[in-house]
Amino acid sequence: GGSWEGSAGDGNTASLQLRLLCRRALADSMDSDDILAVTRAGLDHYHKHYGYTFPWGSYDQIFVPEYNLGAMENPGCITFNENYLSRDTPSFALRQKRANTILHEMCHMWFGDLVTPAWWENLWLKESFAENQGTTTAAEATIYTGEWASFAIGRKAWALAQDQYPTTHPIVADIPDIPAAKNNFDG
């Protein structure tokens, strides 16, 4: 782990322990230096741009096996699929993809956890904003300056393909219950 200290335009200061956790068999694959560099850069960037101090008392990142999501934000703790770790030296592309995911989920600490849409029909708002912010922050605040090119050939191309399928749906949909919310969640 490590630590981070910073402040935002609201005049408050945060002092956080940054913890990285995974199962023991992958401890040597953690790539802590890169993950912590991205984490610190993201915290600095979001504090500067949002003007609101990190609202939670800790910041943990946990890499878990057999996780059916890429990652998930929880107040002060993000869980990631352990596939973001590599037993070999991680490629630049893997590290860049991981950085985007770290920054996307970190954005949710402010826009998703601190401020949350009232109901699932507005899921698109928090997800599209976090997608934009993860890409923007990676490109502006980390060594992954080519992140917008990766977005264009990866995420944008995927979205355009999804829109051609008969299963496509409006961005804002009627979501009467939780199962409908799950069916409306893309990517």
Predicted feature descriptions by range:
Residues 24-34, 119-120, 181-186:
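Second-shell loop/turn segments in exported
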Residues 1-103, 132, 156-158, 165-169:
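Hydrophobic helix-coil surface modules that form long, contiguous segments used
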Residues 106-122, 140-141:
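Catalytic Zn2+-binding segment of zinc metalloproteases
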Residues 63-65, 82, 113, 127, ...:
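Active-site proximal loops enriched in glycine and acidic residues that flank catalytic Cys/His/Asp
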Residues 102, 106-111, 129, 133:
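Active-site His/Glu-centered metal-binding helix of metallohydrolases
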Residues 71, 127-187:
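Acidic/His/Gly-enriched intrinsically disordered linker/tail segments
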Residues 45, 49, 109, 113, ...:
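Short alpha-helical functional segments enriched in proximate histidine and acidic residues
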Residues 53-61, 117-121, 145-150:
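Surface-exposed patches in mature extracellular/periplasmic domains of secreted proteins
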